[in-house]
Structure formats: structure tokens, C-alpha cells
């Protein structure tokens, strides 16, 4: 009898997975790219790669992923976002303080509209490396005036620096790059420069590409994987140990149907397999099917509450829950409704607002009362538009003149009054109602909304607890599809699973690769069981792509 026959299916699966990992670890190449599907052991690989290496660097581009990786790789590697790394390097090499404001490109975009009457997407110019574009001259002029960078322009700056001074590119024992499928041309330029001096390992999955809004392109990981120069050694991690069998099979159904419909053209062909594990098999037996249900919009929180309580009866232990909705307002509605039912451990993950507001400016001025960018932001909200245009044109023609030198004394004093009151609040000093009203009015805060939030928090934190005690501490995260990247939970609820949200084209028969990736990322957050909840009576297209034996339908 052969050794293979003596091994159990679990031992065989473990042996095969180890062989895939060892191929990567034992490769002598200094440039490697690993295509790893959801839950296939990327973090374990990172840990193994970093063993016995001292000077290492791990880069990704999402703050939430940095936090998770920093914890998982604690003591093994410095983990940074690309813009954070660019800022620290530029500061170190230039020996200057580098200021970065995440909405800076939006401000310069508005300046361009008001000063030269042109709509310019500066981030796109940086992301796509349009280095010679004439509009970058205007951007640089405004950057110099405000003494700030944005996230894209700080990466652009360090790339240009390294391209000019190649001898100053730092070297590391190992560089790891996470989520490479979501990198754009600018970010890839930085990675290629760093790869000239250090061993580098890129990890990503072109089936999980979500960030096309920042000009990310799957062609970069595909070119590296398929051997386009510079030559990278290519590997895969095929075994998913996160999800139950039905989730892995459903993901494969989606990919197979997409390919049948001539979608996902150019996709890296790689296996995605359920990892045979004795403990996971118990969860597969307990949760063999995906649950699909149609619920009217306002019934969705009720349905989620009902299912969580059913799961509690079955599990008799705490477990994690992830609620994924297409829109922030849907996520917020569900979160607040669940809180009113007694759930107290809800993490409502809200993406930062893209547009800047007066509070952004006030924050900068609280740190430095002479901050030029802070005064620029505040000016937008205290001046009539014609006065703002005149002010900005003055700063453009006469950049030596600071905004605080142009504003009227009354405007300056009003802002300083607010800053003074806020500093009082910071120091927990008393502020009377009249002064507090000044703050509310100046910062354009919706006092009714603030009061509603306060009362809701007070009710939920009251000693008179509402709802079933068993549900109060269940950890729940409620978020959007894009913000779910990097997350995983025992039980996942995907809400508003309708063509109107999951297929972006007005013609719902036209499905994009991006739509497919969104759905694949959403369902593969699941460890044990997935619930798909539609708010429309029409059967969702993606549900039709999953074999019927993999899901059950629960009527309202």
C-alpha cells in the first residue's frame, strides 16, 4: 500500500498545501509574485518569509489592512501604507517636515476651477503617470503655496526622487507587497524602484480587484505573473482554509459562469480549492447551504436580528457577524436599527467623506493657527464665492501673500473666536450656551442630528439595558463592499443583493468584471455561513450563476 493511500484526506490536503508554500519559500529568486485567493494563507506565508530577517518592509494601501497586518506581523516587519512610507522617506531624505492632507487634491482641483476655470482630475494625472501634463505645473504651484502634499502627490514625489537619485533607494532584507491587484501605474513605479535594491514578494488576486476608481489595473499583477519583464517567479496559493465548502464552490460557480459569458478576459487561471480540514468539516456539515431571502428594505434589520438569534440558539457561544451593504446609508440604517434592538457591540465602518468641510480646516488651525491650508479651507465656508475667487486669484498672482493677510479682520477674529472656544473644550473648561451656539453655527453642525446621536448612545449605554442580554456583546461590523476588503466573519449578511446595486450599468444585462469582483469579495468574507438578502422581488443575476443545490430560499 502506498504512503498516499495510508494518509487521510485531511493529511493529504495539508501535505499539498505545505508543498505550495514550500515552493515559494525554497525558490532562490529575488522577485516573486504569488496569486492568492481569499483565505488561502497569505498571512501565514508572510510570517514564514520574514523568519530570521531583520530589516523588512511590508506595504499595502488601505489603513485598515495596515492595522491588521501590523498585529499579525508584529515584531517581524514594519507595515506601512504607500503614502505613509513615501512621506517618511521624503522627510528623511530631504531632512524636512512633510505635511500631508488626504483631501489635498480636491482642494487644488477646486482652486483650478476657481482660478483658471478648468476641471482637472489631478489624482488621475498622478495615478496614470502623466508626468508631462501641463496642469501639473499649476498643481506644483499650489502645493508650494500651501506646503502640503496629497496621498497621490507624495507617492509621485518619492518616485521622482528615486528616479533621479537611484543610489538613494533604500535596501531591505525583504519587501512584501499586499493587495497588488489594486495598485495603479504610479504605485507600481514605486514598487519597481524598490525591487531594484531588495528581494521582493508581491501578493494579490485579480479576482479581488475593487479599486478601479484610483486607476488601479489588474494588468500589472497579470504582467508580473505571466513573465513580462522584469522577470518574476510565479506561484499560487490554491487552498482556502477560511470558508466552508459551499462558499468556495459558489465562488467557483461565479468564475465559471463569467468565463462562459466571455468575461474576466485575461484573468490569471488558478485553482481555488476548499481545504479539507477535520474541524472545518464540522462547520460544513452544520451550514451546508447559503441562505437567500427577499425582504423589503425596512425589514432587513428585523431579518438579520431574527437570524442572529437563531444562530445563537444553535451555536450557544459568541461569534462574529459582518453585514455588507452596497451603500453607506443602507449600512447606517441597519446599524442604528440593530442598536435599537439591544445590540451594543456594533462597529459601523464609515468611509471618510471625499469632500472637504470646514471642520477639516479648523482641525489644521487648531494644530497651527497660521496654517495656510487651514485658512484656505475655512475661507471657502465663510466667504461668498466671488470673494473666495478673488482671494484665490490674489494668492495665485502673488504667492508671497498669505491668506490670513488677505482676509478681513472680522473674518479672522470670528475664526479665532471659534478656535479659542474649541481649545477651551479640549481642555475641558466650561463653555456657556451662547459660546457653544457660536461653535455650532460656525462649524455648520446639524445640532438636531448631534442630539439624536447623543440620545441614541445614552439610551444604548443606559443601566436599563434593552433587548436580549445574549445579543448585547456579539461583535458586529457593518460596512460597504469596498470597505469589507481584508475582513472576515463567522456569519456574513449581504444586504440589498439586487441587480440595481450589484450591476452598475443601467442595462442590467451588461455585467462588468468589476461587478463580478465586488460579489466575489463580498461572499468570500464568510467563514461559516452566508445570507444573501435582496430588497427587490426580481431574482438577482448573480444568484442564477450559483448552482441551485448550493442555496436555500427562505420566504418572507
Where are each of the predicted segments found?
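P-loop NTPase Walker
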Residues: 1-95, 252, 323, 484, ...
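Accessory N-terminal region flanking or inserted into the helicase ATPase core
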Residues: 1-40, 44-45, 97-176, 185-190, ...
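Inter-lobe coupling/hinge region of RecA-like P-loop helicase motors
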Residues: 4-26, 30-38, 231-241, 260-324
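Conserved helicase core region in the C-terminal RecA-like lobe
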Residues: 79-88, 176, 203, 453-504, ...
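Coupling/switch/interface segments within P-loop NTPase motor domains and analogous charged loops
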Residues: 80-148, 152-153, 393-443
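Conserved RecA-like helicase ATPase core segment
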Residues: 188-286, 543-554
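ATPase/helicase motor core of nucleic-acid motors
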Residues: 227-229, 315-437
Amino acid at each position: 500500500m502506498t504512503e498516499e493511500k495510508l494518509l487521510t484526506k485531511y493529511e493529504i490536503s495539508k501535505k499539498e498545501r505545505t508543498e505550495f508554500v514550500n515552493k515559494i519559500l525554497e525558490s532562490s529568486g529575488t522577485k516573486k509574485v504569488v496569486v492568492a485567493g481569499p483565505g488561502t494563507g497569505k498571512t501565514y506565508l508572510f510570517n514564514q518569509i520574514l523568519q530570521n530577517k531583520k530589516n523588512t518592509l511590508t506595504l499595502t494601501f488601505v489603513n485598515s489592512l495596515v492595522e491588521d497586518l501590523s498585529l499579525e506581523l508584529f515584531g517581524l516587519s514594519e507595515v506601512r501604507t504607500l503614502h505613509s512610507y513615501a512621506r517618511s522617506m521624503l522627510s528623511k531624505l530631504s531632512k524636512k517636515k512633510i505635511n500631508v492632507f488626504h483631501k489635498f487634491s480636491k482642494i487644488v482641483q477646486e482652486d483650478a476651477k476657481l482660478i483658471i476655470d478648468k476641471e482637472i482630475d489631478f489624482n488621475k494625472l498622478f495615478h496614470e503617470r502623466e508626468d508631462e501634463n501641463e496642469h501639473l505645473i499649476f498643481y506644483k504651484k499650489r502645493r508650494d503655496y500651501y506646503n502640503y502634499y496629497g496621498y497621490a502627490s507624495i507617492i509621485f514625489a518619492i518616485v521622482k526622487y528615486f528616479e533621479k537619485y537611484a543610489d538613494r533607494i533604500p535596501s531591505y532584507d525583504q519587501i512584501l507587497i499586499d493587495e497588488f491587484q489594486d495598485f495603479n501605474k504610479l504605485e507600481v513605479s514605486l514598487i519597481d524602484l524598490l525591487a531594484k535594491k531588495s528581494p521582493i514578494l508581491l501578493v494579490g488576486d485579480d479576482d479581488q480587484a475593487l479599486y478601479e476608481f484610483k486607476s488601479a489595473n489588474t494588468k500589472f499583477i497579470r504582467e508580473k505573473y505571466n513573465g513580462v519583464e522584469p522577470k518574476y517567479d510565479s506561484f499560487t496559493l490554491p487552498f482556502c482554509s477560511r470558508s466552508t465548502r459551499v462558499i468556495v464552490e459558489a465562488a467557483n460557480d461565479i468564475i465559471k459562469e463569467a468565463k462562459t459569458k466571455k468575461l474576466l478576459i485575461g484573468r490569471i487561471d488558478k485553482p481555488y480549492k476548499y481545504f479539507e480540514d477535520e474541524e472545518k468539516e464540522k462547520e460544513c456539515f452544520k451550514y451546508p447551504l447559503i441562505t437567500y431571502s427577499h425582504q423589503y428594505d425596512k425589514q432587513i434589520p428585523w431579518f438579520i436580528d431574527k437570524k442572529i438569534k437563531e444562530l445563537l440558539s444553535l451555536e450557544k457561544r459568541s461569534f462574529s457577524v459582518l453585514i455588507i451593504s452596497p451603500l453607506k446609508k443602507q449600512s447606517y440604517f441597519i446599524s442604528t436599527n440593530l442598536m435599537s434592538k439591544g445590540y451594543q457591540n456594533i462597529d459601523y465602518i464609515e468611509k471618510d467623506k471625499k469632500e472637504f468641510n470646514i471642520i477639516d480646516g479648523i482641525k489644521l488651525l487648531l494644530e497651527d493657527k497660521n496654517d495656510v491650508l487651514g485658512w484656505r479651507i475655512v475661507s471657502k465656508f465663510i466667504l461668498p464665492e466671488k470673494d473666495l475667487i478673488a482671494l484665490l486669484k490674489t494668492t495665485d498672482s502673488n504667492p508671497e501673500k498669505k491668506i490670513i493677510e488677505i482676509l478681513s479682520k472680522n473674518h479672522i477674529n470670528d475664526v479665532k473666536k471659534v478656535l479659542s472656544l474649541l481649545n477651551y473644550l479640549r481642555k475641558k473648561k466650561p463653555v456657556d450656551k451662547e459660546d457653544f451656539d457660536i461653535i455650532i453655527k460656525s462649524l455648520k453642525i446639524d445640532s438636531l442630528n448631534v442630539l439624536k446621536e447623543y440620545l441614541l448612545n445614552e439610551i444604548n449605554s443606559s443601566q436599563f439595558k434593552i433587548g436580549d442580554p445574549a445579543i448585547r456583546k456579539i461583535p458586529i461590523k457593518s460596512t460597504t463592499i469596498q470597505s469589507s476588503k481584508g475582513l472576515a466573519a463567522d456569519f456574513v449578511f449581504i444586504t440589498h443583493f439586487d441587480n440595481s446595486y450589484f450591476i452598475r450599468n443601467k442595462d442590467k444585462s451588461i455585467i462588468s468584471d468589476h461587478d463580478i469582483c465586488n460579489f466575489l469579495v463580498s461572499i468570500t468574507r464568510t467563514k461559516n455561513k452566508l445570507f444573501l438578502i435582496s430588497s427587490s422581488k426580481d431574482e438577482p443575476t448573480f444568484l442564477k450563476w450559483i448552482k441551485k443545490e448550493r442555496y436555500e430560499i427562505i420566504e418572507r
